[in-house]
Amino acid sequence: ELYNRPDCKKELTELEKRIYNYFSSLELPDEPTIYDYLVLSLTHKDVIATFNWDPLLIQAFARCHLFTDNLPHLFCLHGNVAVGYCKEHQEFGLLKAQCPICKKYYPPTKLLYPVDQKNYNDDDYIKGCWDATEAMIEESFMLTIFGYSAPSSDKKAVSLLKRAWGPLEKRQLEETCFIDIIDESEIRKRWEEFIYTHHYQYTNDFFQSYLGMFPRRTCETVFATYMLNVPPRNDMGFHKGMTWNEIEELISDLVHEEETTEDGKNYPLHYTNRGLFS
């Protein structure tokens, strides 16, 4: 392995440079993508923790701000080519932006490569992302794992996630969702320490997931369904091939509800038959 060979330092530096430049060159198409649906399916009470180096999720965040500022937090657990970090003031943002304190442009974040022994404490930004992610998982009602196969090179990462999720006997009400092309039986095997009995959903289609069917009210809808026996409507969410105008129309009522809900209050149940509560 190159990381364990001092004589390959020059080659390693060149390889990392090419990797960084390649991922930096990627761009989203103009039409809506899964990245956009994912970002808009969540609100400020949610977190997206990603292992991806590419800038596509960051680009989705930037254009989803045109619809609402009520978007999820984003933590890049292996760094990201589109994110910069000011070590002096512990501020981060878009790579082309400036630190709000010193007004200097953000230096790029470090990328964490798939080596045998990853150290998540070496880099301040990555450590901060992990600390925040663990804290959010500890307090979460739902956990969605989207296309992450838990490779052998990420054993430490999975261990950290499990530590945050805690023992299953303390997760008897929570729900775990998996969106993946891997067979369901294999998913159950890989993630058995995150699944309490039957409290999980598996799908290979984002639009059939809780996030896709109940965007921006996922936790509220799942809780009402299983804890309060309130049947949801699953025909009101995102669907394939939507235009930006259709997305704006779909989420406009949701955003209005969010803007008019008092701080500390729950958002109204949205994906239900209104007659049940009239």
Where are these regions (language model features)?
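Extended, H/D-rich, highly charged conserved domains that either
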Residues: E1-Y125
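SIR2/sirtuin-family catalytic core signature
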Residues: A132-S278
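Generic detector of bulky aromatic hydrophobic side chains
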Residues: I19, L42, W53, F67-H73, ...
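TIR-domain catalytic/interaction hotspot
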Residues: N119, D123-I137
